[in-house]
Curated annotation (Swiss-Prot):
Protein name: Pantothenate synthetase
Organism of this sequence: Dehalococcoides mccartyi (strain CBDB1)
Alphabetized NCBIfam families for the sequence: panC (TIGR00018)
Subcellular location: Cytoplasm
Miscellaneous comment in the UniProt entry for this protein: The reaction proceeds by a bi uni uni bi ping pong mechanism.
Gene Ontology molecular-function annotations: ATP binding; pantoate-beta-alanine ligase activity
Amino acid sequence: MKKLHREICGPVGLVPTMGYLHEGHLSLVRASKKQDINTVASIFVNPTQFGPHEDFKKYPRDEKRDMAMLENTGVDYVFVPSVEDMYPAGFDSWVEPGILQQCLEGAVRPGHFRGVCTVVAKLFTIIRPDRAYFGQKDYQQYLIIKRMASDLNLDVSVEMLPIIRENDGLALSSRNTYLSPAERQAALVLYRSLLTARSLFDEKEHRAEVIRKKMTDVIQHESMAEIDYVSLSHQDTLCESDEVSAKTIALVAARFGKTRLIDNMFLA
């Protein structure tokens, strides 16, 4: 990367990924291509953001496929470090996020965001991008990384792009490959619950308890869904309140068989 820094002229955009790319990732690459002279994608399945009983070992990997997709999308550079590159022997320094990690994904997956922030901070330090691009599907992650970059005076603009969905509304995710046909059909209930929340808000329903109950009912109507959380949170703080507003984001997480999926939607 040091040699690369000497060669690169102009703004650098970074698209950090864990590989097994889909159209959501490629939309981030295209956004960088529009804004930055140089676009770098990274591929690294980060072990420190997985819990002891999560899917690190079986997380889908296909580097050859990913490289072809990135080349076709016009990425300029691809950074594919090894675990030893990112976490050499004796590594013992971590980036610990604050209050934003205490709810939602952070509550269900202890230590997850410590791993995320540490690896992203290292990527920012190694690649030194002007902009970094993240998808809305991992909204809490986006907020935490944006706060980290600000708090640590990292000279990078953290950008968020909208969720990319299948035609039937399922949010694109590398983990969708785990789903059986029946589970995939069942997973559409997450999108339906979010549409329910937005519809109620559009109809002037502002009581969070009422909207959350309706969302929960929609998901529980699907017998294959096991809810982790249904949340109506302020989009800047992730705090819940009794009344929703134009600044509220609805977030859901559920398991379908052994596959855990998340999704979200702004109410306005």
